[in-house]
């Protein structure tokens, strides 16, 4: 059965059962904390959290998902994929356990001719949570599943939560037995290679409290509305129904492998593991890259763009290592389109753009590889010739800085050459470069440090600023500069990611140049007449010698020639947001002085669309009441709809009027004054502002903090950003109130009660944990091993034991071992990934040269930690839990040598 048919049957099955088919969300959501959508239920989270009311009681979808943390494992095993499809059915307060089990079982076991998948019921198993007898009953009732094919499992396997307070509940997983050729019998508990999970049914029935792990949280009580969230792995089902061992053999990925195998001199599945890995990398990454590009991402150096760039570059390099020297990306993207577009038609509709972006990255990276590979080979040879096994940080930095090699590529190439890389040295050099770049950027922003190139234009006279009266102005290009050098013409290069600093100097401009805390306007410059095809985005505007406007641009089409007439146009939405932020800053300043008094003097500010930051001289933090008063006074002034107007006057007259000036700032003899509401606010200011205070919109103070001795900072949102912030907080409060089952006004008291209960529970847990450890200590003393004439207790204790508890326990155990030479070494997995360990040595063992402070060093080396102490008692802590057994073995070996 083809994968598209598997997907279609899933949706058809649930639509017939009264579910609404919900299309897959984009893999890119408007959430900065989520790089890519990585689970089928992500788009439904607001409904499960009670933040939004679902428009349906039942829904079904097949979601595109991307997971890239294990990108380096792709291809090495057949289990890891960066893209997968998760089919899911969801119930929002409608059916529950019985319905979920019945729907899943019916689809899996119904004959193919009846619309099902036709799985043999005798080869299906289920797992349930330890005490979920209800689910067991339904598996027997609905599916006729015998008890011997239903296994109970703990919280780590069969209890679901989102990792934060909110809905949680037991889950039930469905497994398929692939047969004895894949491993021993005994169900999922015995062998998950033979028994492969294909569907997970989550029964959201409880609320969970705080906790830091999958198991460390309190179950608070039942949910008012029980929900269902399920996930069926489409690719896993495809493997089983197509009779293949892994997803790379399915109809989704095998075509890409076959494409490359028809070109490469070495084939797939010929017994060369490294080649097979490269084939699988190409197949997996090409599909994921096409999906990401299709959802609007372009290759870049940060975030999602960087992930995409890395995927594409790994494809290209894997192909090179297989002996494919010619471009291959265009054909790969076409192969992905053919395989995936039956399910995702947007891949066909937007194919030209997807292919163009992928091919452009291939072309650019081929140049990078050609120039950088020789340097890497030379550096690797020199490293080995010197007897070293680690490529220097300087070499890795040069590859990155000069040839564009990402560090991950250098790491891969080094590993293939049996070398490691000095990553710490590389990152130190990168940090130095960033610092230099920051300093250079600051110099360029402050004054275009080298004015010689601009001197002629500076001497010719200032740019006429028209932005107080209009947002679009016709202007003449006085000069064009690329990286500080004057040129007669600049054109669109067609090269993505060009880094040249291109600036236009115009005789007049509506763009506000960054100054006075207000960031520069953004917008466009377009050609006129014969140059009407010329268009550029204005991304920044800086002043040169305080008189000349330098417009930083990205040329998008055509060419600009010195002397041309152009139209400079400010983005009106950007300007409106900037004026809201700047006027809001004046309002907050006035409110601060009204609440705190005249000593609250401005020390600096920053305002941009929707946001303001205001620094002022003040000793000590503001009280909550002062913050509330400042916010209230500001919003009262907004509501008053004060008129905002500006005028120019002599500096002395402005000061006599009471206009506020920034201390230490040099002002000309004639200054611009901005007045809001008569006496409410009067400041010297050259920035852009709203026409009335009501246009600022609501002002929400986000916080107040210290930024230096005697200087405090207030940050706030204004306008729509303020509304969005308040709406988000309201939704969070509603979610909390819903989760806690109390009205919003009672949330603080309820939280305080829960915190107190949690503390009491933690104390009781600590008591029980220590009691259990003491019991284990008694048994440990009785079972001490004899190494030479030294009795040794070297034991791993239960997780969660603190260093203080271990010290108490080693003393108790040592006391039970008598006066013969004895050593006690205890180690445990503590909180926050720590690994505490303690060693105690009695006097008789010390007489034989055994010292506790020496033994903790041995243990520390095994767990990436260190310790110290005295001859009789020493302790330490590490971070490598994987080394605990090695630490205990090292102690035994050390005692054996004593």
Swiss-Prot record:
Consists of three domains; the N-terminal catalytic domain, the editing domain and the C-terminal C-Ala domain. The editing domain removes incorrectly charged amino acids, while the C-Ala domain, along with tRNA(Ala), serves as a bridge to cooperatively bring together the editing and aminoacylation centers thus stimulating deacylation of misacylated tRNAs. It catalyses: tRNA(Ala) + L-alanine + ATP = L-alanyl-tRNA(Ala) + AMP + diphosphate. PROSITE patterns: AA_TRNA_LIGASE_II_ALA. Its cofactor is Zn(2+). It is found in: Cytoplasm. This is Alanine--tRNA ligase. Binds 1 zinc ion per subunit. Keywords: Aminoacyl-tRNA synthetase, ATP-binding, Cytoplasm, Ligase, Metal-binding, Nucleotide-binding, Protein biosynthesis, RNA-binding, tRNA-binding, Zinc. It holds the Pfam family DHHA1. It comes from Mycolicibacterium vanbaalenii (strain DSM 7251 / JCM 13017 / BCRC 16820 / KCTC 9966 / NRRL B-24157 / PYR-1) (Mycobacterium vanbaalenii). NCBIfam families: alaS. The keyword ATP-binding applies. Its main location: cytoplasm. InterPro entries: aa-tRNA-synth_II/BPL/LPL, Ala-tRNA-lgiase_IIc, Ala-tRNA-ligase_IIc_anticod-bd, Ala-tRNA-synth_IIc_core, Ala-tRNA-synth_IIc_N, Ala-tRNA_ligase, Ala_tRNA_ligase_euk/bac, DHHA1_dom. GO terms for biological process: alanyl-tRNA aminoacylation. Gene3D superfamilies: 2.40.30.130, 3.10.310.40, 3.30.54.20, 6.10.250.550, Bira Bifunctional Protein, Domain 2 (3.30.930.10), Threonyl-trna Synthetase, Chain A, domain 2 (3.30.980.10). Its EC number is 6.1.1.7. Zn(2+) binds at residues 582, 586, 685, 689. CDD domains: AlaRS_core (cd00673). Catalyzes the attachment of alanine to tRNA(Ala) in a two-step reaction: alanine is first activated by ATP to form Ala-AMP and then transferred to the acceptor end of tRNA(Ala). Also edits incorrectly charged Ser-tRNA(Ala) and Gly-tRNA(Ala) via its editing domain. Belongs to the class-II aminoacyl-tRNA synthetase family. One of its GO terms (molecular function) is zinc ion binding. GO terms for cellular component: cytosol.
């Amino acid at each position: 059965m083809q994968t598209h048919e598997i997907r279609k049957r899933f949706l058809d099955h649930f639509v017939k059962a009264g579910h609404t088919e919900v299309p897959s969300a984009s893999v890119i959501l408007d959430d900065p904390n989520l790089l890519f959508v990585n689970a089928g239920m992500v788009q439904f989270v607001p409904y499960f959290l009670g933040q939004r009311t679902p428009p349906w009681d039942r829904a079904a979808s097949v979601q595109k998902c991307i997971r890239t943390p294990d990108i380096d494992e792709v291809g090495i095993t057949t289990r890891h994929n960066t893209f997968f499809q998760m089919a899911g059915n969801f119930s929002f307060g409608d059916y529950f356990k019985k319905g979920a089990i019945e729907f899943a079982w019916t689809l899996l076991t119904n004959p193919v001719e009846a619309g099902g998948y036709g799985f043999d019921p005798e080869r299906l198993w289920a797992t349930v949570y330890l005490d979920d007898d209800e689910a067991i009953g339904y598996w027997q009732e609905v599916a006729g599943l015998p008890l011997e094919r239903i296994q109970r499992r703990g919280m780590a396997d069969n209890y679901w939560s989102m990792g934060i307070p909110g809905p949680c509940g037991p889950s039930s997983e469905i497994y398929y037995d692939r047969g004895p050729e894949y491993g021993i019998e005994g169900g999922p508990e015995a062998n998950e290679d033979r028994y492969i999970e294909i569907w997970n049914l989550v029964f959201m029935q409880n609320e969970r409290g705080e906790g830091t792990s999958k198991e460390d949280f309190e179950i608070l009580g039942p949910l008012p509305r029980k929900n269902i969230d399920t996930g069926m792995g489409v690719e896993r089902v495809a493997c089983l129904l197509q009779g293949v061992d892994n997803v790379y053999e399915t109809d989704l990925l095998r075509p890409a492998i076959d494409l490359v195998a028809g070109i490469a001199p070495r084939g797939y599945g010929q017994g060369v593991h490294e080649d097979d890995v490269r084939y699988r990398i190409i197949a997996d990454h090409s599909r994921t890259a096409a999906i990401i590009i299709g959802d609007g991402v372009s290759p870049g150096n940060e975030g999602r763009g960087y992930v995409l760039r890395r995927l594409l570059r790994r494809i290209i390099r894997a192909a090179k290592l297989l002996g494919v020297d010619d471009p291959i990306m265009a054909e790969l993207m076409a192969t992905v389109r053919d395989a995936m577009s039956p399910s995702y038609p947007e891949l066909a509709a937007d194919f030209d753009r997807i292919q163009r972006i992928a091919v452009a990255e291939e072309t650019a990276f081929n140049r990078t590889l050609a120039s950088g590979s020789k340097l890497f080979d030379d550096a690797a040879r020199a490293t080995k010739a010197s007897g070293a096994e680690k490529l220097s940080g300087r070499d890795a930095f040069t590859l990155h800085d000069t040839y564009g090699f990402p560090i991950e590529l250098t790491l891969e190439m080094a590993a293939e050459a049996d070398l490691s890389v000095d990553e710490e040295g590389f990152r130190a050099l990168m940090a130095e470069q960033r610092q230099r770049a920051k300093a250079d950027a600051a110099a360029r922003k402050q004054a275009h440090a080298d004015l010689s190139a601009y001197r002629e234009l500076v001497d010719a006279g200032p740019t006429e600023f028209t932005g107080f009266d209009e947002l679009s102005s016709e202007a003449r290009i006085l000069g064009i500069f690329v990286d500080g050098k004057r040129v007669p013409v600049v054109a669109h290069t067609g090269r993505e990611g060009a880094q040249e600093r291109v600036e236009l100097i115009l005789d007049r401009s509506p763009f506000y140049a960054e100054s006075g805390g207000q960031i520069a306007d953004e917008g466009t410059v377009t050609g006129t007449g014969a140059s009407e095809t010329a268009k550029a985005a204005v991304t920044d505007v800086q002043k040169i010698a305080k008189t000349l406007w330098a417009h930083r641009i990205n040329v998008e089409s055509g060419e600009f020639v010195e002397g041309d007439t152009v139209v400079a146009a400010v983005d009106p939405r950007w300007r409106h947001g900037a004026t809201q932020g700047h006027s809001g800053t004046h309002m907050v300043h006035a409110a601060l002085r009204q609440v705190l008094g005249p000593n609250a003097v401005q020390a600096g500010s920053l305002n941009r669309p929707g946001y303001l930051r205001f620094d002022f001289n003040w000793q000590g933090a503001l009280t909550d009441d002062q913050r509330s008063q400042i916010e209230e006074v500001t919003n009262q002034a907004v509501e008053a709809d004060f008129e905002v107007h500006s005028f120019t006057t002599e500096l002395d007259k402005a000061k006599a009027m009471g206009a506020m000036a920034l201390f230490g700032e040099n002002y000309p003899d004639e200054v611009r004054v901005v007045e809001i509401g008569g006496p409410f606010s009067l400041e010297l200011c050259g920035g852009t502002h709203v026409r009335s205070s009501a246009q600022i919109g609501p002002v929400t103070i986000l916080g107040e903090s210290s930024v230096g001795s005697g200087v405090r900072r207030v940050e706030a949102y204004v306008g729509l950003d303020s509304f969005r912030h308040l709406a988000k907080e309201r939704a969070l409060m509603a979610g909390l109130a819903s989760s806690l089952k109390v009205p919003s006004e009672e949330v603080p008291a309820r939280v305080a009660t829960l915190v107190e209960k949690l503390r009491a529970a933690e104390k009781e847990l600590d008591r029980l944990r220590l009691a259990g450890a003491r019991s284990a200590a008694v048994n440990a003393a009785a079972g001490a091993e004899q190494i030479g004439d030294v009795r040794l207790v070297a034991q791993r204790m239960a997780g969660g034991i603190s260093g203080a508890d271990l010290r108490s326990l080693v003393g108790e155990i040592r006391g039970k071992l008598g006066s013969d030479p004895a050593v006690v070494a205890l180690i445990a997995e503590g909180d926050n990934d720590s690994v505490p360990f303690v060693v105690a040595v009695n006097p008789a063992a010390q007489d034989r040269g055994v010292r506790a402070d020496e033994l903790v060093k041995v243990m520390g080396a095994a767990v990436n930690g260190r310790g110290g102490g005295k001859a009789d008692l020493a302790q330490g802590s590490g971070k490598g839990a994987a080394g605990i057994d090695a630490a205990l073995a090292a102690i035994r070996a050390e005692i054996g040598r004593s």
